[in-house]
Swiss-Prot record:
IleRS has two distinct active sites: one for aminoacylation and one for editing. The misactivated valine is translocated from the active site to the editing site, which sterically excludes the correctly activated isoleucine. The single editing site contains two valyl binding pockets, one specific for each substrate (Val-AMP or Val-tRNA(Ile)). Pfam families: Anticodon_1 (PF08264), tRNA-synt_1 (PF00133), zf-FPG_IleRS (PF06827). Belongs to the class-I aminoacyl-tRNA synthetase family. IleS type 1 subfamily. It catalyses: tRNA(Ile) + L-isoleucine + ATP = L-isoleucyl-tRNA(Ile) + AMP + diphosphate. Keywords: Aminoacyl-tRNA synthetase, ATP-binding, Cytoplasm, Ligase, Metal-binding, Nucleotide-binding, Protein biosynthesis, Zinc. One of its GO terms (biological process) is isoleucyl-tRNA aminoacylation. Its main location: cytoplasm. This is Isoleucine--tRNA ligase. A motif ('HIGH' region) lies at residues 58-68. L-isoleucyl-5'-AMP binds at residue 561. GO terms for molecular function: aminoacyl-tRNA deacylase activity; ATP binding; isoleucine-tRNA ligase activity; tRNA binding; zinc ion binding. Catalyzes the attachment of isoleucine to tRNA(Ile). As IleRS can inadvertently accommodate and process structurally similar amino acids such as valine, to avoid such errors it has two additional distinct tRNA(Ile)-dependent editing activities. One activity is designated as 'pretransfer' editing and involves the hydrolysis of activated Val-AMP. The other activity is designated 'posttransfer' editing and involves deacylation of mischarged Val-tRNA(Ile). GO terms for cellular component: cytosol. The lineage of its organism: Bacteria, Pseudomonadati, Pseudomonadota, Gammaproteobacteria, Enterobacterales.
Length: 938
């Protein structure tokens, strides 16, 4: 028996079946870096239309976690896809480098500034620590396959950026948005500093819930308001609070003007309560019997006076819309120094903004004899007892409620009025203008717009000052007496900025005011405050994007971060850009959800359900992590577990196997020499290229809409269904057995070449490492990297008016599927081994029969059987199986006649007709010794 193996066109490629990504990817990264891939892309894209995705800077502290990976991979997919769409999309990664977390880490290492080290030494240590953290995170981000200018990232602690942050504040001052005031701000007693809204988290806390009597100063006047002449005993207005520690700062009681209030007689006294809450208060206080003596509106009680229960002065009743009937008594204890609503209503009534609490959370001396020096949360119980002694406590309970806490320390925070600098939301119309700007931005998902609109509409003025050591100085001079800003503030700030640009922020603390103030130095002092770090990152659209030449003066197109950044970076950037330039800093804002485990639980070290991106890359590879990110609908929670990653690895293998089949069967194909013209190609080959064209249109649209999970779904469908289970299956016979340089084979290779050219580009933004690997195995002259390319424009399809158009092949796929069911059952019943042992008969209605017969003898190649014939539907016997999908089709099969050809494995009756090749079928003889078979359709 002759060996005809060397007459076959067997697949051959250097592209391995196993990805072995964890081992191969680091070598690719080394090559990318040594060859300056990022620089090559920039050169290739120069002069194209620009798309700027501005990187929201992660904080330079600690290792990257799985959430960081999601964020950076999504950004990288977009940047690479934009490159494929013909954009120049420079990507400059950044880091947020100032602020408290770094201070706390450095304190642990060298102690607090002013104790063991000077402030200057402390800042230098912070700078060094932040730089080390940046380097550690940078390595992990690069390992993800993220392309960017990693050698020249932006750091908020770069001298030039620090200087530009000062210039941003100067512009805001120039536009009259800055003011100073003693306002209640979120204050962490552990940090000893005010907190931005984005630095506040909410956790459950148990607090005392108390109802407190404020006795009326003039009982007769109050009784008269209710029309009650028969009131017995003292009259008190009852407030409800869960923060007894704020009572020393009480300066009023707020009522709602429109609510009805009742004077209620109980044993020995009268209580004033909101009509709708009387029953709940009585139940809470354990009072079974009461009598309503009269009613009046809240507005009738305005400015009546009530005695503070222990501070020795009286306070007015005032009116405010913030009073609700959700809980309590309908009367709200009002301390303008300890709450934003209280402050606003206090301003309206000219109330004192009292703040008896120091930065450490302890009462100042002179507050109250038993409270001086006491920590506020410890004072709650002392105040409850004090109220009990004074006869002012109506009821005390414990309440578990959601309470604001410091994001770093996880400890409860307080509202505390301190002298601070604010960007005003309303004095120059910043709120109104910001709300207008929001409308011009595309929010992805679209619910992001309503979310940030609500936040902007309701947010207080932004407290931008901090009492910290490691931060950008506000760089302000104020008058010693009046505390007014120096009239030449913007000019002076530019002088400071120039010094900072040379020497960093330490230049401010080293500055002798006389150097730039001259004679004014006698009357003005430096403001010691630093800027909120959210101002640092929020101004990068100006301090970085406007300043770096590679952005070419273009403003950012997109900001992309987690959904918590509506109140963080998106908000601070919007406020600063609108205050500086009168416009939003972005055109599109895309948000992604948070990572959770396979059961939907938040990632937590205590639960033990965290997944380290480093571990995933070391075990499975970066492309598996990237494919997982792309496969997930990032608009909601993003689930990750070992099982989910295993599914991503399975999907990856299917895609890789498809790519490997394409490459292996392009062996010996030179596109410059061997391409077949579309009109001369076998019809099914043109159909396959057309399916790639249709897939590409959908994939390009999905990339354009940032629907990466749809990209992956379409890619998988193309590889598994249209290619894997149909086209790649039926071409094996022609590809392997046809004459090597025949049109039949070269037509097939031409199709595979076009498909591979398209496929590698579809993959590149997501599976970047594998796309690069495929690109290097592709035949023909080509640029060095796929990442410099655009979507493949060499695809073509079948004409719609051809008889064998897409509709024809879609029907044929169904027919083949129905035949496969019959053959699968036969295999299961051990009646045949492989499908080539079968000869099938398709009983079809006339129209379907005509379409099937148009394939002539090549129908069998589509069905992967040794023989196939079409008969009249009416002639089908009882043994014919009715198709479930196609009403006009019945199927039977028999064992194929003849012998098995050892070369093509088809069963045929023409083996041995040519003496020189006595073992071969006639078709194989033609392919081995003749001109080669002709194929028209399949």
């Amino acid at each position: 028996m002759s060996d005809y193996k060397n007459t076959l066109n067997l697949p051959e490629t250097g592209f391995p079946m196993r990805g072995d990504l964890a081992k191969r990817e680091p070598d690719m990264l080394k090559r990318w870096y040594e060859q300056d891939l990022y620089g090559i892309i920039r050169t290739a894209k120069k002069g194209k239309k620009t798309f700027i995705l501005h990187d929201g800077p992660p904080y330079a502290n600690g290792n990257i976690h799985i959430g960081h990976s999601v964020n950076k991979i999504l950004k990288d997919i977009i940047v690479k896809a934009k490159g494929m769409s013909g954009y120049d999309s420079p990507y400059i990664p950044g880091w947020d480098c100032h602020g408290l977390p770094i201070e706390l880490k450095v304190e642990q290492l060298i102690g607090k500034p002013g104790e063991k080290v000077s402030a200057a030494e402390f800042r230098a240590a912070c700078r060094k620590y932040a730089a080390e953290q940046v380097e550690g995170q940078k390595k992990d981000f690069i390992r993800l396959g993220v392309l960017g200018d990693w050698d020249h990232p932006y750091l908020t602690m770069d001298f030039k950026t620090e200087a530009n942050i000062i210039r941003a504040l100067s512009k805001i001052i120039d536009n009259a948005h800055l003011h100073k005031g003693a306002k209640p701000v979120h204050w962490c007693t552990d940090c000893g500093s005010s907190l931005a809204e984005a630095e506040v988290e909410y956790y459950d806390k148990t607090s005392p819930s108390i109802d407190v009597r404020f006795n009326a100063v003039d009982v007769a006047t109050v009784s008269a308001k209710f029309g009650a002449a028969n009131a017995n005993g003292p009259i008190s207005l009852v407030i409800w609070t869960t923060t007894p520690w704020t009572l020393p700062a009480n300066r009023a009681i707020s009522l709602n003007a429109e609510y009805n209030y009742q004077l209620v007689q109980v044993e020995g006294e009268c209580l004033i309560l909101a009509e709708d809450l009387v029953e709940s208060v009585m139940k809470r206080a354990g009072i079974a019997e009461w009598t309503v003596l009269g009613s009046c509106k809240g507005s009738d009680l305005e400015l009546l006076r009530f005695n503070h229960p222990f501070m020795g002065f009286d306070v007015p009743a005032i009116l405010g819309d913030h009073v609700t009937l959700d809980a309590g008594t309908g009367a709200v204890h009002t301390a303008p120094g300890h709450g934003p609503d209280d402050f606003v209503i206090g301003q309206k009534y000219g109330l004192e903004v009292a703040n008896p609490v120091g930065p450490n959370g302890c009462y100042l001396a002179g507050t109250y004899p038993t409270l001086d020096g006491l920590f506020v949360f410890k004072a709650n119980d002392v105040i409850v007892e004090l109220l009990r002694e004074k006869g002012a406590l109506l009821k005390v309970e414990k309440l578990v409620h959601s309470y604001p806490c410091c994001w770093r320390h996880k400890t409860p925070i307080i509202f505390r009025a301190t002298p601070q600098w604010f960007i005003s939301m309303d004095q120059k119309g910043l709120r109104k203008q910001s709300l207008e700007e929001i409308k011009g931005v595309q929010w992805i998902p679209d619910w992001g717009q309503a979310r940030i609109e609500t936040m902007v509409a309701n947010r207080p003025d932004w407290c931008i000052s901090r009492q910290r050591t490691w931060g950008v100085p506000m760089s302000l001079f104020v008058h010693k007496e009046t505390e007014a800003l120096h009239p030449r503030s913007t000019e002076l700030m530019e002088e400071v900025a120039k010094r900072v640009e040379q020497d960093g922020i330490q230049a401010w603390w080293d500055l002798d005011p006389a150097e730039i103030l001259g004679a004014d130095a006698a009357d003005y002092v430096k403001v010691p405050d630093t800027l909120d770090v959210w101002f640092d990152s929020g101004s990068t659209h100006s301090s970085v994007v406007d300043a770096r030449p590679e952005f070419g003066g273009h403003s950012p197109d997109m900001y992309l971060e987690g959904s918590d950044q509506h109140r963080g970076w998106f908000m601070s950037s919007l406020m600063i850009a609108t205050a500086m330039k009168g416009k939003a800093p972005y055109r599109q804002v895309l948000t992604h959800g948070f990572t959770v485990d396979g059961q939907g639980r938040k990632m937590s070290k205590s639960i033990g359900n965290t997944i380290s991106p480093q571990d995933v890359m070391n075990k499975l590879g970066g492309d598996i992590l990237r494919l997982w990110v792309a496969s997930t609908d990032y608009t909601g929670e993003i689930a990750v577990s070992d099982e989910i990653l295993k599914r991503s690895a399975d999907s990856y293998r299917r895609i890789r196997n498809t790519a490997r089949f394409l490459l292996a069967n392009l062996n010996g194909f030179d596109p410059a020499l061997h391409q077949v013209k579309p009109e001369e190609m076998v019809v099914v080959d043109r159909w396959a290229v057309g399916r790639a064209q249709a897939a590409q249109a959908e994939i390009m649209e999905a990339y354009e809409n940032y629907d990466f999970h749809l990209v992956v779904q379409r890619l998988m469908q193309f590889c598994s269904v249209e290619m894997g289970s149909f086209y790649l299956d039926i071409i094996k016979d022609r590809q392997y057995t046809a004459k090597g340089d025949s049109v039949a084979r070269r037509s097939c290779q031409t199709a595979l070449f076009h498909i591979a050219e398209a496929l590698v580009r579809w993959m590149a933004p997501i599976m970047s490492f594998t796309a690069d690997e495929i690109w290097n195995e592709m035949p023909g002259e080509r640029p060095q990297y796929v990442f410099t390319e655009e979507w493949y424009d060499g695809l073509f399809g079948l004409a719609g008016d051809e008889s064998m158009n897409d509709t024809f092949w879609a029907e044929l796929l169904k027919v083949r599927g129905e035949v496969n069911k019959v053959l699968e059952q036969a295999r299961s019943d051990k009646r045949i081994g492989g499908s080539l042992e079968a000869a099938v008969t398709l009983f079809a209605t006339p129209e379907l029969a005509a379409r099937l017969n148009s394939l002539q003898d090549e129908l069998r190649f589509v069905l992967l059987t040794s023989a196939a014939k079409v008969a009249d539907y009416a002639d089908a016997g009882d043994d014919a199986l009715q198709s479930e999908l196609i009403s006009g089709l019945k199927i039977t099969f028999n064992k194929a006649d003849g012998e098995k050809c050892p070369r093509c494995w088809h069963y045929t009756q023409d083996i041995g007709l040519v003496a020189e090749h006595a073992e071969l079928c006639g078709r194989c003889v033609t392919n081995v010794a003749g001109d080669g078979e002709e194929r028209k359709y399949a």
